[in-house]
Amino acid sequence: MRVFAKVGLIILLGLYLIILSKLILFKYLTIPDIINHFTFSYEGAIWNQHNFIPFKTIAYYLFLADINANIRIENLVGNIIGFAPFGFMVPLLSKRFLNLKNVIMATACLSLLFELTQLIFKFGSFDVDDLILNTLGGMLGYLPIKLIWIFIVQRQKYSSKDA
């Protein structure tokens, strides 16, 4: 049963990554557009649409943006929520990820992969703030697993003392 659950979780993680890729990279693109991006023949995004300054976009959405609050919330909270499942699933797949530092590194690397893909293939715009928010999302997704793990370890400690 344990192996079956792990295989199911790997499949679930794969589906999650496919959906996340669709939402981040291919949000508004048609199949021909996607092909053009990979052949570098796309004439779309330019460098000034990218953000390499930490907290610039976050500050803009929180304090300066003269846009609908729903759009601001979707952009800020959406990045956090989008990566929370990753932070939740990876510790279930490997004990190596029961350590917060490893979850942070894995989430940051996954987010960086998406951001660099957007930068190189012009699927959107690179934003260092997305990297920050996505990593925060992975950390928040990790918290329930860590709390459950602490509860289980404490419970095992007390039950072994009673025996």
Outline where the language-model segments fall:
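Bulky hydrophobic segments
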Residues: 1-123, 128, 142-163
